[in-house]
């Protein structure tokens, strides 16, 4: 485990960082957003406490991403692009498992995000379902 890796609970001072992180996400990794929310919408979302746990990922005192746990034990993880690497991803997930021990975790990964799919498998996750979405604008 990396000694300089920290998972810090989010607070109000992190809102701007989280918005910047969201704005830099690759479109292929979006599962929960069709379009970028406004900053005000983003703050409302954070303040609605949508997750049971939400942490800033920090290495060497630099914020590089976030990781959260939904109320259904689903893990979400996002890094700034320059910090996406498999060893770092694995270290963050392992640290998260130590911080939030549970019997069972889920991870939603876009089927287009092959890097995260491979990493999830390396960490012992296995495919349990395919989820499909119907876009209301495409009715028959």
Placement of each model-derived feature along the sequence:
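Conserved GNAT-fold acetyl-CoA-binding loop/helix
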Residues: 26-44
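Conserved acetyl-CoA-binding loop-helix of GNAT-fold acetyltransferases
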Residues: 84-99, 114-118, 122
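Conserved acetyl-CoA binding element of GNAT-fold acetyltransferases
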Residues: 70-82, 108
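A short helix-loop-beta-strand connector motif used in the catalytic cores of GNAT acetyltransferases and
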Residues: 44-56
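Conserved beta-strand-loop-alpha-helix junction that forms the acyl-donor binding cleft
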Residues: 106-117, 133-135
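A short beta-loop-alpha structural element at the N-terminal edge
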Residues: 4-20
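Conserved beta-hairpin
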Residues: 53-65
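Conserved catalytic-core motifs of GNAT/GCN5-like acyltransferases
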Residues: 126-139
């Amino acid at each position: 485990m990396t000694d300089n890796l920290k998972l810090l609970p989010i607070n109000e001072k992190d809102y701007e960082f989280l918005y910047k992180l969201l704005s830099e996400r690759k479109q292929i990794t979006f599962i929960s957003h069709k379009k970028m929310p406004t900053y005000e919408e983003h703050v409302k979302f954070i303040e609605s406490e949508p997750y049971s746990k939400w942490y800033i990922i920090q290495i060497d005192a630099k914020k590089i991403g976030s990781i959260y746990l939904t109320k259904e034990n689903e893990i979400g993880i996002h890094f700034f692009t320059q910090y996406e690497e498999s060893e770092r991803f694995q270290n963050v997930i392992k640290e998260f498992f130590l911080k939030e021990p549970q019997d069972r975790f889920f991870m939603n990964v876009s089927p287009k995000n092959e890097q995260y799919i491979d990493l999830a498998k390396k960490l012992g996750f296995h495919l349990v379902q395919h989820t499909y979405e119907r876009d209301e604008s495409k009715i028959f």
